[in-house]
Amino acid sequence: MPSILNRLEKLKAKRLGIRIQDFSNISAQSQLVMEEHSRLGDVQVRLPKADHPLRMGAYSYMREGGEILHLESIGRFCSIGRNVVLGQPTDNHPIDWVSSSMSVSGAYEAGCVYSSIGHDVWIAHNVVVMAGVKIGDGAVIGRNAVVTKDVEPYQIVVGNPGKVVRARFTTEQIVSLMKSEWWNIDYAALKDLPFDDVDVFLK
């Protein structure tokens, strides 16, 4: 029966335009809730708890080579590059025990705090987002950044550790974009909007 159910789920996903490159990369206890036209490349998914699924929004994608660990959500219209690690725990080895090796410290249990990614977030290649970090809507994370603190909406972050270099738009424009919640508009209507001019878009 489980194999039949899995087959039905895969057929349903295909009809919705959902793509998962390799199901074998998803651990047995990892549960995914994916909206239409969301895509996962060759990504390792190892969520810590079966009762805490990952929710991935419509039209978001994550390219190959990455890992999803302590992560609870990816918003809509997110673009996530290659070799990105989302929800990297800081305490997955016991540094205050006699040995940090799990060969002799197997009884150790790491904490469990989750990261989240907002809507319309662009994360470039080779980024690490630490567990517990919240990345706001519209943020941009530059290549090779290590994000250790929350990122406010529409901020651009680069470096290790990641630091904000500037905002994408003015404060007024950011407030208006957040109020618009354009990512919840029907996709057919979105295609006719002027995405190349923020002021015209917000009128």
Model regions and ranges:
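C-terminal segments of enzyme domains that contribute to small-molecule binding surfaces
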Residues: 3, 99-130, 161-203
